[in-house]
Every structure is written in C-alpha cells, then in structure tokens.
Amino acid sequence: MQFKVYTYKRESRYRLFVDVQSDIIDTPGRRMVIPLASARLLSDKVSRELYPVVHIGDESWRMMTTQMVSVPVSVIGEEVADLSHRENDIKNAINLMFWGI
C-alpha cells in the first residue's frame, strides 16, 4: 500500500491521498497518509521540496506534507495511482518537514 494513491471515502476538502506508511509496520486499522491538493491551488513559489508536485492522469497535484495524518482504513477508497517511482521525493519531503534535511 505504501506510495499508492487512494480516493478518500469521507467528505473532505481533499479527494485523494498517498499512503506513506511502511508496509512492514502494523498499526491495526490505521494508515499514515498525505493528502493531495490540486496544484492550481498553490503558488509556484511554494516549496516543491516540501510540497512535491505529482501527476495523476492529466492532472497535477501537490502533496500536502504538513497535513500528514493517520486515517482509519475504512476511509481508504479506490487505488488510483502508484507513486513508487517518486519514493525519494516523498521521503525527502517528510525528512524536510521533521528534521529540516
């Protein structure tokens, strides 16, 4: 499930999120996720290191790294993309947020 993008089953300002939790860490009934926001909503001046741009289909999204949250698995909807190829960018954004590196 790590680095997969899913729809959010609950009503929220975010429609999609990326699962960032390691698959070897078992937290029964919960997953750590980062919501995605339409890239149009953020200025190009906003850090692409902290808020990476990802492309899903023909749309651009920004990872809202500072909005990382634990969600119940019951809100995880349909898988819509795999961002495994962006693993380093995702990890770097998380490292930047927590450790400034």
Swiss-Prot record:
GO terms for molecular function: DNA topoisomerase type II (double strand cut, ATP-hydrolyzing) inhibitor activity. GO terms for biological process: plasmid maintenance. The keyword 4Fe-4S does not apply. Keywords: Plasmid, Repressor, Toxin-antitoxin system, Transcription, Transcription regulation. It comes from the Bacteria. InterPro entries: CcdB, Plasmid_toxin/cell-grow_inhib. Belongs to the CcdB toxin family. Homodimer. Forms a complex with GyrA, probably a tetramer GyrA(2)CcdB(2), in which GyrA is inactive. Forms a complex with toxin CcdB; the CcdA-CcdB(2) trimer is sufficient for rejuvenation, whereas maximal operon repression occurs with CcdA(2)CcdB(2). Toxic component of a type II toxin-antitoxin (TA) system, functioning in plasmid maintainence. Responsible for the post-segregational killing (PSK) of plasmid-free cells, also referred to as a plasmid addiction system. Half-life of over 2 hours. Interferes with the activity of DNA gyrase, inducing it to form a covalent GyrA-DNA complex that cannot be resolved, thus promoting breakage of plasmid and chromosomal DNA. This is Toxin CcdB.
